[in-house]
Amino acid sequence: MRKHRIGIAFFYHESHSFSPMKTEIEQFRNEGYFIGDEIYDAYTGTKTEVGGFLDVLKHDEDVEIVPLLCAAAIPSGVVSTEAYSIIEKQMLESIQQAGRLDGLLLALHGAMVVEHLFDPEEHLLGKIRVLIGPNVPIATTLDMHANLSEKMIDYTPLHFGFKTYPHIDMYEQGTHAAIALLNQLKEGVTYYASFEKLPMMPPSINMRTAEGPMHKMIEWAKQAEEEAGIYNVSVFGGFPYSDIPVVGASVLVVSLDPQKGKETAQKMASLFWSVREEFIMDLPGVREGLALAMSIEDDKPVVLADISDNPLSCGSGDTTELLREMVKMNIPDTLFGGLYDPESIEACLNAGVGNKISLSLGGKVSPEFGEPVQVEATVVALSDGVFHNSGPFNQHLRVDLKGAAHIRVGKMDILLIGRPMSANDPEMFRHIGLEPATKRILGLKAKNHFRAAFEPIVGRIIYVDAPGVASNRLTTFTYHYIPKPIWPLDDIQYEVKRRGTEKWTH
């Protein structure tokens, strides 16, 4: 019996239209750029979408895995035309050179923006569909913050969104996508997609799935999946920092019964609209947040999350308002990190461990959100910045900070890192000898993903409203291309309208 040849690919970026940092090809090569068999070494045993693809396929003796191309970059500004073109060209060439493909598993983000493309994932799927033909099944995984468009569903109904934030079910959704693809390929299952796009782009700060409005939505989605004829329900919050016509929240129902799928999508969209106001949060400023942290008596550290400069929300990782106030207060047993500052790391390398040095910290990429902080520091430790995640988010994945330095300023410790990276795993600190669990206050460049690994070792978590490109106050951005009217920028009425249903036949 001829084996089913199934390709695996990954093209992942979350793009911020207002970030000062354009995303070039170097960012992809620094984060993760793997071709062919390199994909096995990079992702086997990881709790990622591609790890899920591999685990399902390698246990099916009727399948031949065809590793193609995986490219990912840390969230930042829009992807340059050159970078996108290089990766798209190489991916399409890898598909052409692979020969016969009977199916394709593709991990995407869903919130990529390119200089010349508002909807690059749809563009890529269209190019792939031309290459492999209309009858080869494709299944994708998508981030919960995807700005999903109806055009993407023209190419396949099989899109599986994450159901957790922090995203700790990437592996699970990878397995779901692979199983659905095999069902279609081997059993002839026909899937239907029912899609509802809502006129809203809620701030992502309150999209955590442990509690709040997105928790409600995911619970309703899981209940719907228990009903006959419903295969999968994805709830996408969208990415509100994308200034594009397809921005915003949506619901996608993959079903075996098109009428049931349509009814479920409409119901879920109505529920989503009904909880929209619950996504709005009022956050304390930096000084107010620090005062609150100082008032808390706890055996565990209090976290001050600098959410407006979270690198995984495309922040530069080097804004300074929270850092400046913490340095002024000089509180014992405090830790701040990771601050993106390769220049200061280089200065620490030149000075050497144990020596004192004058540094100008942060404020180099985004000085409009705070000038550099002038400090006298002691170099405590230096590192190449390489570690492996131990927490549930991207578990076991290798991380390369491109260098790191532990410095002490007064009574506080600061971790400097060589590229923007959210402080989502304690190993970022532990790999250089810092134990966050022993501190009184942690100032973290992070938003929600860090909770997966940090919640067991910390106490109170306080989000602070400091200046930054990832502010939860969407009125601070000047949009040009988003659809209007749209909530929360506009006060509008909305009712779910009946839509057509796309059908995919194999």
Question: Where does each model-flagged region fall?
Answer:
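Cap/lid and interdomain-hinge subdomains that line or gate substrate/regulatory clefts
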Residues: E64-V66, P75, A139, A146-S149, ...
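Extended hydrophobic packing segments that form well-structured cores
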Residues: P67, W273, V386-H506
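Flexible inter-domain linker/hinge segments
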Residues: K186-Y191, E196, M200-A228, V246, ...
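Glycine-rich phosphate/diphosphate-binding loops that line cofactor/substrate pockets in enzymes
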Residues: M1-K3, H59-D62, P67, E93-D102, ...
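N-terminal amphipathic/basic leader segments beginning at the initiator methionine
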Residues: M1-H59
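Hard-cation-handling environments
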Residues: I6, I205-K411, L415-R419
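Active-site histidine-anchored catalytic micro-motif
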Residues: G7, F11-E14, F18-P20, F28-R29, ...
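Low-complexity, highly charged intrinsically disordered N-terminal segments
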Residues: L54-P75, V79-A83, I87-S94
